[in-house]
Amino acid sequence: MAAALVALRRRLGFGNTSLAFLLGGAVAIASGDLAVTASHPWAELLRLLRGLVSPDVMAVDGRALLNTVAFAVLGVGLGAAAGFALALVFPRFLAVRALCAFLRSIHELFWALLLMQVLGLGPLTGVLAIALPYAGIFAKVFSEMIEEADLSTLRVLPTGTGTLPAFLYARLPDLLEQFGHYTLYRLECGLRSTLVLGFIGLPTIGFELDAYFKQGEFSQAAALLFCFYGLVATRRLWARSWTAPILLVASLLVLPAGLPTEHVLRNLARFATHDVVPAPLRGADLLSAAPWTALARWLGDILVHQVLPGALNTLILSQIALIGMAMLSLVLFPMICRRFARRFGRPVGRALLVVVRSTPDYMLAYVLLQTLGPSMLPAVIALVAHNGAVVGYLMGRQADALPYRPDAPRGLDLYCYETLPRLYGQFLAYVLYRWEIILRESAIFGILGVTTLGFYVDGAISELRLDTAVVLIVATAALSMTVDAFSRWLRAALRIESLPVRLSTDAAGGLATAPVPVGLS
């Protein structure tokens, strides 16, 4: 096996890797359900467009806006604090790295669905659903920032200075600015996550959007959506280092009260001692062979009838979306490049990409599902649009940083023979990195009816088979971590593992693509 991997690594190249993914995408397209099943899709799309151009601002619920910000601030803040604590021991302990990988491999929606069984639809459910995966993300990113920080200040410390004082006084002051900028950038991601949590009942903008979309009130939905874009667009104005304490305190005051403590403790006891215990083991004599034989049959049934078909459809959907995202990003990135877009075209292109990447793909798929009908097609379009805009934006920034000769060609020749060949390694780094993110998102689209792993998770929770739901969620996490590990192996084999792969924030608070520790976005 090891020899085969070494041989494969030697044969890998940009061309062979691209061809393999294209062939995989072709097989996935042939296998996927991409039909338009709605009776009158164009009529529904026209109604949606009419609503977008005539927003009803009187329908905006200010409380939902405040809740959206509050959930995001508290969830990201708690995740950053926990991630910082984990980052201090992240490089030393394999168990910590495995825990962080597990936390971030489970989507916020899955965390929320589980937490609801204990905490109900209270504020703590939304905050923890964001904080848990973000803690894993922050731990990894903060750990890499710590490892790559300047160590010169340590050399002037007195001999015998302890590890903790040395870190607090010599290293932390230099890292605080990086930590702060990354945390504030993550707040934008938290806002998108909070909106999506509203679709399963939490009192955010997403809850209002869900109601308006179901009723066909697209003008009201458009007004709320534009307010959300306003929150994201102005994030750098109201979310700064000096406003963070104010936002945290205000968020605590804004959120409604949750379940009484005694109810939470009772729910937690039931959840841990009954709900998630596999059905064959409940009340059984664990010293006899019968319950363990029944457990094996129970797990085998879940594996054959739910995990395998769900995982296959998740991989099919993610592979189609990955190829579509790659192609779309190659088309989009010239829209924001000085060498390709004209003076007035760049601002329009930049605004378009920012709006599309700020739109949660789950919400976009939800809307398209109502207009195109149930199939993989709405999910594919949503994943391709959102991730294609992200990668296109990053590629455009990289293209602007390239030095060109004075006699460089123009137009299509410049794109095909100079810009794209020089950026292709960076392009593959972005695509391979987004692979795991797309797969994680593909799994949760099952909640909308696409038969990915999330479809079976949602069904199990709806039927109160929480033991089955936990098995399916663990399987989803295992699939996500496997794809992530393979993606990292491919990037190392192609010698592109050191290239930047995420949106980050520079010292001025703007988006940057300079080489920074690899994070998750």
Locate each region found by the language model:
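Hydrophobic alpha-helical transmembrane segments of polytopic membrane proteins
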Residues: 205-240, 453-489
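Membrane-cytosol interface at the C-terminal ends of specific transmembrane alpha-helices
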Residues: 123-186, 190-193, 374-438, 485-488
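Short hydrophobic, aromatic-rich alpha-helical segments embedded in or entering the lipid bilayer
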Residues: 40-48, 201-213, 263, 270-272, ...
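N-terminal, non-cleaved signal-anchor transmembrane helix
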Residues: 1-73, 77, 81-85, 89-92, ...
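Transmembrane alpha-helices and adjacent helix-loop boundaries
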Residues: 38, 47-51, 92, 105-112, ...
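Generic hydrophobic transmembrane alpha-helix motif, especially the helices
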Residues: 103-134, 353-384
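Hydrophobic positions within alpha-helical transmembrane segments of bacterial inner-membrane proteins
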Residues: 72, 76-88, 109, 178, ...
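Cytoplasmic-entry segments and transmembrane alpha-helices of multi-pass inner-membrane transporters
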Residues: 85-114, 331-367, 393, 397, ...
